């Protein structure tokens, strides 16, 4: 039961972060999953596990959220990924739900070019640590 709850909390927190990113009005909305064939942005959560568990069963769960982007214009892509990192790590308040709250977002991996496709689209990757408090 608690594994299902944690997955639900993590999914809700990731969707909330995606909503923050989509509010930045970048060249594309961000979607969960893999990059498509055209220009775009995607995110997906990596391995998560509680960082701390307290006697009252509250937990801090650091999510490793991978952000990938693809665009045929390197400057457009670089500005978008950098805007995501700057905007989310500088926020003073974060979304919350009934049993969870994002308490901090930091850069885990700086944005970097990881390749260029045959279609001449650049691919960039980065990741954020999204720290979520649960069972508030």
Q: Where are the language model's segments positioned?
A:
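Small/polar-rich, solvent-exposed N-terminal microdomains that initiate assembly or binding
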Residues: 1-57, 79, 91-101
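Predominantly extracellular/luminal cell-surface or secreted proteins
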Residues: 31, 70, 87-89
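Intrinsically disordered, low-complexity regions of eukaryotic proteins
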Residues: 46, 65-66, 103-106
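Residue-level signal for secondary-structure boundary sites
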Residues: 51-53, 73-77, 134-136
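Short, solvent-exposed beta-strand/turn "edge" segments of beta-rich domains on protein surfaces
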Residues: 53-60, 116-121
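Oligomerization/assembly interface segments of phage tail-like spikes and tubes
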Residues: 59-75, 84, 122-133
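Acidic-leaning, charged glycine-interspersed low-complexity segments
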Residues: 88-136
């Amino acid at each position: 039961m608690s594994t299902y709850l944690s997955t639900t909390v993590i999914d809700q927190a990731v969707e909330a972060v995606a909503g923050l990113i989509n509010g930045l009005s970048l060249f594309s909305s961000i979607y969960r999953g893999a990059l498509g064939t055209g220009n775009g942005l995607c995110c997906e959560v990596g391995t998560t596990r509680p960082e701390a568990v307290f006697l009252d069963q509250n937990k801090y769960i650091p999510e490793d959220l991978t952000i990938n982007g693809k665009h045929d214009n390197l400057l457009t892509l670089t500005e978008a990924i950098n805007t995501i990192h700057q905007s989310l790590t500088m926020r003073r308040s974060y979304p919350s739900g009934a049993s969870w709250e994002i308490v901090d977002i930091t850069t885990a991996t700086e944005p970097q070019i990881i390749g260029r496709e045959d279609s001449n689209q650049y691919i960039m990757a980065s990741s954020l640590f999204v720290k979520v408090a649960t069972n508030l």
